[in-house]
Amino acid sequence: MDLVKTHNLLPEGVSTTDARSIEFATEVINCLPYEPNDEQMELLAAFAHFMLYGHPQAVMLVNGYAGTGKTSMIGGIVKALTCRGRKTVLLAPTGRAAKVFTEYSGHTAYTIHRKIYRQNSYLSDGFSLAENKHTDTIFIVDEASMISNSSEGSFFGTGRLLDDLIHYVYSGIGCRLVLMGDVAQLPPVGQSESPALNAEFLRSYALQIYSVNLKQIARQAAESGILFNATILRNVMESGVLCAPKLELLRFDDIDNVTGEFLLETISDSYDRDGMSETIVVTRSNKRATLFNRGIRNSILYREDELVSDDMLLVSKNNYYWANDYEQIDFIANGDVVRVKRVWGEIERRYGLDFANVTVEFPDHGNTEMDVKIILNCLSSDTPALTATQSEMLYTSVMAELTGDKRTRYRELKKNPYFNALQVKYAYAITCHKAQGGQWQNVFIDMGAIMPDAFSQLDFYRWLYTAITRARSQVYLINCPLDTDMPSF
């Protein structure tokens, strides 16, 4: 099984050695702090032709594995385009991914949802596709592996994000799209592959395809244990022979195996050194995340109350109610991380649930502060959000208190702060899908509950690869069941 085609795909007859293409490539090179390798030069040449001569319905697909310099190359391309006065819009699937994109590109990136959708009206049930008023603009989307085309339970446009993104971009005069990501990462939840990184799937939109695949580890990353071991996993996936690889840790300082005996101490040291916002535990399930969150709050942070100031929380369900009065945030997204600034008053117990009034800030949205009501019951549960039974109980209990005909009561329900309370989990340990698109200085990867049969499943390797590549500086493998070249400390 091939993870990705091993050759680049360019439209028939494309030449990337003309003077204008070479001129643009030179401009990008001047924006880079290093000399590009051969693969990176191929990317520059292909992008130059895409920009200068590509069909109006052309799309560029950039797959770059961890350590291949994809992000720095795109950063250089954005700088060169800006110097030329060429308009660009940078997008990412989540607020956290947009923040990372902003940091490495030097230009503001937005979430896809914020850019391409508009709310139908206050208290409406959804968002419509907005009009693309941009002209002659290149839309560059990072972390495209996260873009789904499934319509289940979506309030946005057609519900198929990739369809809507493509329709939005190409409805603008002279606008084109660049999709970049890493096919070795986890695909969207419930999908076997990432449709936005699949050239054949994109061709079904009648688009002209430019596809470049970066595989060569950049010289600057060659000494990284994180990237060395990510490459081991990638090679296993590409080979199609899924057998447990031997990880190499001994000669690297940035990846270690840690046992439970030293885990709390090591996490605590990471908090002291880099802060809670730069340390994350990545797990395989919500149940494991709940166990780690409980242990961290009890044994490292010594927090006895269920919710206190400085608690980090993860939003577990989209919410369209609380952000209405805030220009910076259109809606609160599933996966957004918030920090508790203040807890107001006493816990309210209503409708069989516990509620708290809090002020939170959004680190991935310019530290915007917002007063919200949250549901506490999800914090310590093994489910990602309220169960179907709890949700139904909340709905029927609130509706029973409202008066008027069914339409009037439903309109009032949409205004009810209890029905619209934020559903949140603790954010010290999260699942890998929730971590995707983000980066932290220190990443602890929970491998203690992994069964041997996982080693024959592609999903396991994608999960571990995605988790390892969330780290900027240090990876700790917790009770790693894979063979390594060093003992646990």
Regions found by a protein language model. Give the residues of each.
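Short, solvent-exposed amphipathic alpha-helical segments in soluble enzyme
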Residues: 106, 296-300, 462-463
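Generic structural signal for buried aliphatic residues
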Residues: 43, 313, 338, 440-443
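Conserved helicase motor core of P-loop NTPases
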Residues: 18-24, 47-48, 55, 170-175, ...
